[in-house]
């Protein structure tokens, strides 16, 4: 999987609402599924695929089977 880092935000300053606000607009008919751990969330797209979004000190890194999201 390939990831791309966008705006640098510390995961310590993010809340579930921040995650939703930053994530949902990127996916048509997508929905937040669960918090995997303090730095990882899983977002399910319509269908069977899902995207893992990692929050690290470098920012929000999004990975989805080699597809890049900015």
UniProtKB/Swiss-Prot annotation:
Biological source species: Vaccinia virus (strain Copenhagen) (VACV)
Protein name per the record: Uncharacterized 7.5 kDa protein
Top-level taxonomic group: Viruses
């Amino acid at each position: 999987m390939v990831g791309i880092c966008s705006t640098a935000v510390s995961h310590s300053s993010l809340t579930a609402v921040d995650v939703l606000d930053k994530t949902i607009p990127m996916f048509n008919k997508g929905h937040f599924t669960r918090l995997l751990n303090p730095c990882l969330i899983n977002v399910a797209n319509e269908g069977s695929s899902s995207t893992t979004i990692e929050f690290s000190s470098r920012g929000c890194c999004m990975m989805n089977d080699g597809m890049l999201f900015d």
